[in-house]
Amino acid sequence: LFGFSDSLLRRQGGYFEDDGTKRDTADTSVFDPLICELAYRWFCPVEGQVIDPFAGGSVRGIVAGCLGRQYWGCDLRTEQIAANEVQAEQIAPQVRPVWVCGDSMETLADAPEADFVFSCPPYADLEVYSDDPADLSAMSYEDFAAAYYDAIRLANARRTAHAVERHSEEMASAK
């Protein structure tokens, strides 16, 4: 496949030190670029639009750009968006990812229509990202579950389904 899993993880500041050794850390996890690449190749059309309501790190956006997919991701933390922009500039995908800062419950209304909704949401309080009351990782489990499912419903509302018949043009398009 693309063959940049290890290098992207290193640039992301994730699991590997600069010399390639595994880092022993309690930091937040880094999304595996190989899983991301496979998901995009299998489930998102070329030049398709990916929507990510819980963007976090840069991996999903950079891999989308490297594969020619459009990417729109949302994260609450300005420092995370800034770090993602720096990493995207260093790696320079052919299609630049778009990251917006804000609560996905508010920003998804302005997101483009999606061909593929793909994310890695917080795991309740397993990894805590901030003390922002809108941060799912800072919520009680009950509040987390309610907010998580609401965000997923909003993200899914941004996708468009297409049906194509074997010998004709596109037959239907529906939200």
What is the predicted function of each stretch?
Residues 1-175:
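Class I S-adenosyl-L-methionine-dependent methyltransferase catalytic core
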